[in-house]
Amino acid sequence: DGGRNFLRF
């Protein structure tokens, strides 16, 4: 998900 992509950090 583009919105949840930051959570992959």
From Swiss-Prot:
Entry GO CC: extracellular region
Keywords: Amidation, Neuropeptide, Secreted
Gene Ontology terms describing biological process: neuropeptide signaling pathway
Sequence positions bearing Phenylalanine amide: 9
Statement: the UniProt record of this protein carries the keyword Secreted: yes
Chief place where the protein resides: secreted
Location of the protein in the cell: Secreted
Family: Belongs to the FARP (FMRFamide related peptide) family.
Protein name as catalogued: FMRFamide-like neuropeptide FLP6
